[in-house]
């Protein structure tokens, strides 16, 4: 503008173009209209041509300044920034700016959302999605349970007695007769086969148990004649001693070993009860009966050779019995 005022004489001295624009009272169109009027410059052709070129340059400069300031105002009035009071005023102009940049206002706002808020929204969306998935899965798991009638079960059992694995054709025919679907018939046969296998397995277990009990049945109290008749070499080698032992140990008849000494002055002694057979059996051990069977077996000739261990045991037991009987006899004689 200083260049214009120096070269050309103006009729009036108006304010400068910068003051005109920056003051806020005028606009770019007002300035350009005032510069295009004939009364603004002198009427000479050279002045008019120079004024036209200068006005074009000024118009280009003002348009560049206007675009820059427009961008600044739109950035300040962006809807992406929170608590902006100028958003409503610059919304229309902002649409053109963001359209020129290749994105819309919604895209800008979606990019400028705070991270905390976006994470909270994401968690809520995930929870809603999980609830929807759980509802869908629960609805899928819920199955319809078929209740069979007696007629349907009768028809199914008839076919099962013939075959446990019916083919597709048989299942379809059975489904038509029972008014069921082929899938329901197939599932029934699967369950029926599983039940049949379970019963068969249980029956086999019970049969094995009964067979084991019948095979290994042992009586608790066997008879006395079931024992084998074993010969005692000690008594067979000494027949005279065997007769003495037999007469002393066997409770068949009261012998001299067991009979107490009958003294005239001691007849009323309480130890005279040894003559009673009941007292004899009560005071004698049960192994005497086993010794009797051994001795009787040797007499009948149905014996066999015993092992050395058994011989030693039987001999030691016999010696102990002899000592016990001698001690009892001595006590009875002393009485």
Curated annotation (Swiss-Prot):
Top-level taxon in the UniProt lineage: Eukaryota
InterPro entries: HD, Homeobox_CS, Homeodomain-like_sf, OAR_dom, Paired_Homeobox_TFs
UniProt-listed GO biological process terms: embryonic skeletal system morphogenesis; negative regulation of DNA-templated transcription; positive regulation of DNA-templated transcription; positive regulation of epithelial to mesenchymal transition; positive regulation of transcription by RNA polymerase II
Gene Ontology cellular component terms for the protein in this record: nucleus
Compartments, as annotated in UniProt: Nucleus
Family under the similarity heading: Belongs to the paired homeobox family.
Subunit architecture: Binds DNA as a homodimer; required for transcriptional activation.
Annotated protein name in UniProt: ALX homeobox protein 1
